[in-house]
């Protein structure tokens, strides 16, 4: 049963496998990260070079040209990642699409430079969900007595310090001069009955008394007494490590004690490894400050005299840090940085000292503070250290830098504390006056300021300290009392934002939903429902209008201040601003047919601005309406008319060329507001909706009955209708029961019931007349359906196909120039017998719906409402799919399986059972083998062997497909060429399919063994991502083919011209007139032995070397090869045999066969001398240069023999690969790559390796 693999060890490294949807999300996210890193390479020098490249091509490039050009200037970008070439092409393709905003497939220089400028201006405005900082508000929670739970707990003295203990979810605090620690519930404010009282050991005293008895004898009496001592707490610290979970206290009796929480309260804790030994230590001096190093299990204790003592928990020993040049006054705060192996200490002497925890010596001393330091804090993610003191300022440091980075100012009183909220970009500071400032670390900008005050005006709060509670995030301040401040008090996990989202747009290229709310835009991943990024502070005012251009590459945004801007959908950068209105923006339209932007505002003005990419704003004309208010705006691309709807029920039509009014339609009811406009494709009609619940069909030119209503129907109150029906049915049933109990004639009872039902029906008909106001309406051309939302929060779907059929038939008759259509040309169509059908109706929200969006490709409806929710609906059935939620505690995607690293074995989530298909086949074959052994049948064994052969064939074919992306050996080289290739056995870390195919692992898993095939079961929306994935992959594959073809053509062209296109230098072996040149255009001497090369020999040699160098280079960079690994590969027996055969062939080859060589070239014999195996890798490279190997080949030395060890030859191959990376056609790389390993007994005589081994 050797065919079965061993059980997975817990120490084995495993790789999580996610569902295809989550995997595809990770692939796209990785592409975005690589693209962000790639754009950092656009420094001024690179941009200047690219400008010259653009200039050669008339300042514009196509996609393939852009990739070819930029690739040449990104040779040092991410050279060690697998599948680098493919990733580079993917990134450059995404970059091209991101820059090409007009979608013409051509990248202009203006587009490129504008993108670079945009990228620099929006870095601070792009945030993640964690970066977004909300505000703090005062909580109603206050300290309450434990007995009554409604009376306020009063403290006798100031509360000196407060900290949060997550293990028991309590706030620990103590009063000034007290030896007792109190515990408070942060949710209710109730103080615990059980407290922690620090009681020192009693003092043992022996007293003697002398007495004289009656007889005159003297007696001495001895008594033993215990005196109870009192102490006060100086500092407290909680160790959250699971191994300890101990509360430490330092007191003025020079003791530091550890306390453990139990069911009986707090007791002295013992060492985890020795229960008999208590966590208690007596120091020589009082400890005023404590800091814990969780990595090394060390406690740093700061003393009053400025000394720092180290207490090693494991050995219960102590050690002092060096005193020379250290603190001279009491240490106020210390903070450990275990990952950086630093300790920071701040004291009242104003010094901030950074200690090296490895040798316990000073690393740096910062002297920026002019007065004493009171508090320290550290942000591990950004590697920033913060120090606050009595000089009113917070200094920001980087532990690796000697100088100050930044100063946070704004306080007017001495600072008492500074805290970094872990996992966020917030820094909280508190001063002695109770002023609190919230600062954004990444922008160093003030976010919020508030003051901590007490309800009692007679007494000040006198703040002393503060801490924070992580979940839910709260700030706890202590002074005369305890006050709590809640973060994002109005936070609701089901909301999309604190503000109402005015709409929700879908961008297919990003697979993201855009929800503008307030002055920011949130981007939601359509694959997982998570927030991808946030465009913050987009506008000065609140966003009131949001729409996308025709290509969905630009955002058109208007705000409450009348400002309009065009922004990039990829990065949120502002491209340009449109002419400003004097009031709130209502709607913006991108009229692509006339290349204009049309905007309407509350000032009753309509601006028409030319869409001229990055040029200046060109306002074409302005239309001003009087005595009305614009409610909706539309544009007909066929007639090129601007359609304006107003609050008075008038729909006006204006010519876009002249601005003149062409006609209008008015509702019969005055002030019947028009709420929406919808055009019908290929038909001269529009659909309008009103606040009275009417859906109107209005004719447009060229119809002679233009600007007239040809048909309408009403939006009935479905809820009211249903209630009336239920009411009638209920009343009928009640009357029937009453009549049955009174034994009344059944016939008369039925008659009365029918009579009442008829009355109810008439009442219902009266109710129908009160139609619901329509807030939004969208028409779908393909499904012939009309989707609308009303004021009651309902969304409905109407099938209007019969109405459209009549309109289409009538319009076709109008286009008929015969006499038969002349009569119908003048008369509106007849709708007798035409019915519209309500397909479905659904209660979407319990408040008014703000917007309604329809995504036809995904059969998706999106609603936003004033309840701050965004919901996704199935447009076919009206069922709720999911909703966007700002849930901070949302679970991360869970793996569906695990893969053992370095193998093809795949295990379930419990790491107990293999679930890969290969395992399934192995088990099947193993069972068949056992069965055949029992039967003793040889034929069955043969069939098993055939099955194994098929399995091996499938595995080999799979491996061939996975290796398809690796560089292929030249077929002309044969076996000998493969043996010479030093990098033949290198494999990339990941194959192409493994890295870019989201279904790669799913195709290898036995799906019947999976517990679940979804990594994110919380997200119910199923976007058809396969369509986007296949489309992008097909374009990349075709693009790779085009690029390879162009590179081949370019290579042939440069070879014919003898010019290297990359550095524009002449290669000596490509110049026909070599004898006339002594130096190349790069001012480097030409090799002497290269001058006499024949062209035919050089060409053949170059093709072989090119292929081997490129393959070796790609495989080295993909597998991150090291010299030891190369040496082990070169010691392969097969390679040595091939090299031996090649040497023998060269020795035994007759002179006639070598007559084609030029007489000026001597065949160099490079004998390899076995080197010392214990040499370091660094010496190999040093040896290479010490022997001047490089200079000998570069400048054409005539030395006939150079002796090299195997490690040095390996280094030479690496140098060849590096030279090829610099320049693929560099002749120097050809020379280095041809170095071969040979062993010799004499200076020139070569001996086969096999014979030397025998000796």
Curated annotation (Swiss-Prot):
Example GO molecular function: calcium ion binding
WD repeat feature ranges: 228-269, 282-322, 326-365, 368-407, 410-449, 496-536, 538-577, 580-624, 625-664, 669-708, 769-808, 844-883
Highest rank taxon of the organism: Eukaryota
Cellular component aspect of the GO annotation: cilium
Region (Disordered): 941-988, 1140-1160
Keyword field contains Repeat: yes
Subcellular location, record wording: Cell projection, Cilium
Location of the EF-hand domain: 87-122
Biased composition (Polar residues): 1148-1160
Gene3D superfamilies hit by this protein: YVTN repeat-like/Quinoprotein amine dehydrogenase
Annotated residues for binding of Ca(2+): 100, 102, 104, 111
PROSITE patterns in the cross-refs: EF_HAND_1 (PS00018), EF_HAND_2 (PS50222), WD_REPEATS_1 (PS00678), WD_REPEATS_2 (PS50082), WD_REPEATS_REGION (PS50294)
Keywords of the record: Cell projection, Coiled coil, Repeat, WD repeat
Bias (Low complexity): 953-969
InterPro entries: EF_Hand_1_Ca_BS, EF_hand_dom, Quinoprotein_ADH-like_sf, WD-EF-hand_domain, WD40/YVTN_repeat-like_dom_sf, WD40_repeat_CS, WD40_repeat_dom_sf, WD40_rpt
Listed Pfam families: WD40
Record-stated family: Belongs to the CFAP337 family.
Primary role: Associates with components of the nexin-dynein regulatory complex (N-DRC), a key regulator of ciliary/flagellar motility, and might act as an inner dynein arm (IDA) hub or linkage.
Subunit composition and interactions: Associates with components of the nexin-dynein regulatory complex (N-DRC) and the CFAP184:CFAP263 complex.
Name under which the protein is recorded: Cilia- and flagella-associated protein 337 B
Gene name in the database record: CFAP337B
């Amino acid at each position: 049963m050797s065919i079965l693999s061993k059980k997975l060890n817990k120490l084995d490294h495993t790789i999580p496998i996610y569902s295809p949807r989550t995997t595809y999300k990770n692939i796209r996210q990785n592409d975005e990260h690589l693209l962000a890193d790639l754009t950092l390479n656009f420094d001024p020098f690179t941009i200047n070079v690219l400008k010259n490249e653009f200039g050669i091509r008339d300042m514009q490039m196509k996609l393939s040209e852009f990739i070819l050009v930029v690739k040449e200037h990104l040779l040092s970008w991410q050279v060690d990642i697998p599948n680098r070439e493919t990733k580079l092409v993917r990134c450059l393709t995404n970059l091209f699409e991101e820059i090409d905003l007009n979608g013409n497939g051509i990248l202009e220089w203006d587009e490129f430079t504008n993108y670079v400028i945009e990228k620099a201006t929006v870095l601070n405005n792009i945030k993640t969900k964690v970066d977004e900082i909300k505000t703090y508000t005062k909580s109603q929670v206050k300290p309450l007595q434990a007995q009554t739970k409604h009376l306020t707990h009063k403290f006798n003295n100031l509360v000196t310090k407060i900290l949060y203990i997550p293990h028991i979810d309590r706030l620990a605090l103590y009063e000034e001069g007290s030896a007792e620690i109190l515990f408070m519930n942060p949710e209710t404010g109730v103080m615990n009955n059980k407290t922690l009282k620090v009681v020192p050991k009693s003092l043992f005293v022996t007293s003697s008394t002398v007495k004289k008895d009656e007889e005159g004898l003297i007696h001495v009496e001895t008594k033993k007494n215990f005196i109870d001592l009192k102490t006060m707490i100086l500092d407290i610290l909680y160790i959250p490590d699971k191994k300890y979970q101990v509360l430490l206290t330092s007191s003025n009796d020079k003791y530091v004690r550890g306390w453990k929480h139990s069911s009986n309260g707090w007791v002295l804790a013992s060492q985890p490894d020795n229960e008999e030994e208590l966590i208690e230590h007596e120091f020589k001096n009082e400890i005023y400050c404590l800091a814990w190093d969780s990595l090394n299990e060390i406690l740093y204790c700061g003393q009053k005299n400025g000394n720092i003592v180290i207490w090693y928990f494991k050995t219960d020993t102590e050690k002092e840090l060096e005193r020379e040049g250290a603190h001279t006054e009491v240490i106020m705060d210390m903070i450990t940085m275990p990952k950086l192996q630093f300790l920071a200490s701040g004291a009242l002497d104003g010094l901030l000292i950074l200690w090296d925890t490895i040798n316990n010596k000073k690393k740096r001393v910062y002297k920026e503070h002019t007065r004493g330091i009171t508090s320290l804090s550290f942000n591990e993610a950004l590697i920033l250290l913060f120090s606050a003191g009595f000089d009113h300022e917070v200094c920001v440091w980087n532990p690796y830098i000697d100088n100050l980075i930044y100063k946070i100012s704004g306080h007017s009183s001495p600072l008492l504390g500074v805290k970094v909220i872990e996992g966020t970009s917030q820094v909280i500071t508190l001063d002695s006056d109770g002023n609190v400032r919230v600062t954004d670390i990444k922008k160093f900008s003030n976010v919020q300021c508030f003051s901590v005050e007490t309800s009692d005006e007679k007494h000040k709060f006198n703040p002393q300290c503060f801490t924070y509670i992580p979940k839910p995030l709260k700030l706890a301040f202590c002074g005369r009392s305890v006050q709590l401040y809640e973060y994002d008090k109005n936070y609701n996990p089901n909301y999309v934002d604190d503000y109402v989202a005015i709409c929700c747009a879908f961008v297919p290229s990003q697979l993201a939903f855009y929800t503008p709310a307030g002055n920011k835009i949130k981007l939601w991943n359509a694959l997982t429902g998570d927030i991808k990024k946030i465009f913050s502070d987009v506008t000065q005012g609140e966003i009131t209008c949001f729409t996308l251009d025709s290509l969905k590459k630009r955002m058109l945004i208007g705000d409450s201040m009348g400002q309009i801007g065009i922004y990039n959908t990829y990065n949120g950068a502002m491209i340009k601003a449109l002419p400003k209105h004097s009031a709130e923006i209502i709607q913006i339209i991108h009229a692509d047919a006339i290349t204009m932007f049309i905007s309407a505002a509350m000032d009753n003005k309509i601006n028409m601005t030319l869409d001229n990419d990055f040029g200046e704003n060109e306002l074409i004309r302005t239309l001003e309406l009087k005595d009305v208010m614009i409610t909706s705006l539309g544009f007909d691309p066929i007639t090129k008319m601007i359609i304006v709807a107003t609050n008075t029920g008038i729909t006006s039509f204006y010519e876009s060329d002249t601005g003149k009014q062409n006609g209008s339609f008015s509702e019969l009811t005055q002030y019947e507001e028009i709420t929406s406009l919808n055009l019908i494709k290929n038909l001269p009609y529009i659909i309008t909706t009103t606040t009275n619940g009417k859906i109107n069909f209005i004719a447009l030119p060229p119809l002679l009955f233009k600007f007239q209503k040809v048909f309408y129907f009403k939006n009935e109150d479905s809820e009211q209708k249903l209630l009336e029906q239920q009411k009638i049915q209920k009343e009928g049933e009640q009357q029937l029961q009453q009549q049955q109990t009174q034994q009344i004639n059944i016939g008369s009872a039925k008659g009365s019931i029918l009579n009442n039902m008829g009355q109810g029906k008439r009442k219902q008909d009266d109710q129908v007349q009160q139609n619901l106001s329509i807030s939004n309406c969208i028409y779908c051309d393909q499904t012939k359906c009309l989707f609308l939302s009303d004021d009651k929060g309902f969304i409905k779907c109407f099938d209007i196909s019969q109405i459209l059929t009549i309109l289409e038939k009538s319009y076709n008759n109008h286009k008929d120039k015969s006499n038969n259509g002349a009569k119908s040309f003048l008369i509106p169509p007849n709708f007798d017998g035409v019915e519209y059908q309500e397909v479905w109706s659904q209660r979407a929200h319990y408040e008014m719906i703000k917007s309604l969006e329809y995504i036809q490709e995904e059969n998706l409806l999106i609603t936003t409402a004033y309840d701050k929710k965004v919901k996704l609906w199935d447009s076919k059935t009206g069922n709720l799919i999911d909703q966007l939620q700002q849930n901070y505690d949302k679970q991360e995607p869970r793996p569906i399986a695990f893969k053992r690293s370095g193998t093809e074995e795949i295990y379930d989530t419990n790491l107990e059972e293999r679930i890969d298909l290969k395992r399934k086949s192995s088990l099947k074959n193993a069972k068949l083998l056992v069965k055949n052994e029992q039967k003793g049948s040889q034929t069955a064994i043969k069939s098993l062997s055939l099955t194994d052969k098929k399995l091996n064939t499938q595995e080999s074919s799979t491996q061939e497909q996975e290796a398809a992306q690796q560089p292929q050996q030249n077929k002309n080289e044969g076996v000998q060429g493969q043996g010479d290739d030093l990098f033949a056995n290198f494999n990339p870390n990941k194959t192409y399919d493994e890295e870019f195919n989201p279904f790669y692992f799913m195709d290898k898993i036995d799906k019947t063994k999976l517990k679940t095939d979804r990594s994110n079961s919380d997200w119910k929306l199923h976007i058809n991502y396969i369509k986007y994935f296949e489309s992008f992959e097909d374009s990349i594959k075709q693009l790779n083919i085009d690029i390879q073809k162009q590179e081949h053509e370019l290579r042939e062209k440069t070879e014919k011209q003898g010019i290297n296109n990359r550095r524009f230098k002449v290669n000596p072996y490509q110049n026909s007139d070599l004898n006339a040149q002594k130096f190349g255009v790069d001012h480097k001497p030409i090799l002497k032995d290269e001058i006499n090369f024949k062209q035919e020999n050089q060409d053949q040699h170059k093709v072989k070397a090119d292929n081997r160098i490129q393959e070796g280079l790609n495989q080295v960079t993909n597998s991150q090869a090291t010299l030891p690994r190369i040496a082990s590969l070169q010691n392969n027996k097969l390679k040595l045999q091939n090299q031996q055969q090649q040497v023998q062939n060269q020795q035994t080859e007759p002179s006639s066969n070598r007559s084609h060589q030029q007489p000026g070239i001597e065949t160099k014999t490079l004998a390899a001398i076995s080197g010392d195996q214990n040499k370091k890798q660094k010496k190999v490279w040093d040896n290479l240069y010490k022997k001047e190997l490089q200079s000998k080949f570069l400048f054409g030395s005539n030395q006939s023999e150079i002796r090299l060890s195997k490690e040095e030859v390996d280094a030479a191959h690496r140098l060849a690969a590096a030279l090829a990376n610099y320049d693929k056609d560099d002749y120097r790389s050809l020379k280095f790559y041809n170095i071969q390993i040979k062993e010799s007994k004499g200076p020139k005589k070569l001996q086969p390796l096999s014979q030397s081994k025998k000796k």
